Design a protein with these regions (language model features):
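Hydrophobic alpha-helical transmembrane segments of integral membrane proteins
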Residues: 220-222, 228
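Residue-level signal for alpha-helical context at structural boundaries
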Residues: 58, 123, 193-201, 243
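Juxtamembrane interface at the cytosolic side of transmembrane helices
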Residues: 228-243
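Acidic, S/T/G-rich, low-cysteine, solvent-exposed domains in lumenal/extracellular/periplasmic regions
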Residues: 1-191
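Short, aromatic-rich amphipathic segments at membrane interfaces
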Residues: 164, 169, 194-220
Length: 243
């Protein structure tokens, strides 16, 4: 709670914040309330779902693939790029907050859903993963929410996953760009948000021809040993003269 109070004071003073919350079952909170999630819900109407997103777009159902982004400075140049979120929870908005601009920033495809039957998943049971339309949030599932206060000019981005930003996943697809852009935007540095696709360069190894190979062979077989031998003779002659 003390850490949350410090973050709260920082945000209320106009600071920017990037939050990455793992699914509750993967944290130390387990069934206990998360103070940070409570603060985000009460102050900004952000709902961090008690769920795990299932997405069969990838070969691993618990790796959510984001292929759609809201129109926002963070993602304006990311259209066409996908980003991967291993073991992520849903992040959405609720209620009315007239002094806030809130945007669901990152979305999965329609065939994904936020699975709420975590007990079965934790039990290691062999279950068929199917969404429950009456309980689970059906896709497209929001994986991140961005908030901008109209009065205090503070900025927040809340992700339902932290693994997408670790060393193993940072360079995967658009993950690194999404994280860096989020930090730049939260810090009020929109001018640093530059995502210019680099033209791919095709490199082809051209093997040397016979003439070139002959020169290389001649150099290694004759010139290099000859130079070493010549240097040795010169040193020997100089020593003879001194002696």
């Amino acid at each position: 709670n003390e850490e949350v109070e410090k973050l709260k004071a920082f945000v209320e003073s106009g600071g920017g914040l990037v939050v990455m919350e793992e699914p509750l079952v993967l944290t130390d909170f387990a069934d206990r309330p998360d103070p940070l999630a409570t603060y985000l819900s009460e102050s900004f109407g952000i709902v961090l779902g008690n769920d795990i997103v299932v997405d069969f777009t990838s070969q691993q159902p618990f790796v959510a693939v984001a292929n759609s982004y809201a129109s926002h400075p963070i993602t304006q140049k990311m259209q066409g790029l996908v980003s991967l979120f291993p073991t992520t929870r849903s992040v959405s908005v609720t209620g009315e907050f007239n002094d806030l601009n809130r945007t669901e920033l990152v979305l999965t495809a329609e065939n994904a859903w936020a699975e709420t039957d975590l007990q079965s998943l934790q039990g290691g049971e062999q279950i068929e993963l199917q969404p429950d339309p009456g309980v689970d949030m059906l896709g497209p599932v929001s994986l991140a929410v961005v908030i901008e206060s109209l009065g205090k000019q503070n900025r927040l981005i809340v992700y339902g996953d932290a693994d997408f930003a670790n060393d193993a996943n940072f360079m995967q697809y658009g993950n690194g760009d999404l994280l860096i852009n989020s930090i730049d935007w939260a810090a009020g540095q929109e001018n640093l948000i530059k995502l210019t696709p680099k033209d791919s360069i095709q490199r082809v190894l051209i093997p040397p021809g016979r003439y070139t190979m002959g020169l290389i062979l001649f150099g290694f077989v004759f010139l290099v040993p000859g130079a070493v031998l010549f240097s040795g003779i010169v040193v020997w002659i100089q020593r003879r003269k001194r002696g």
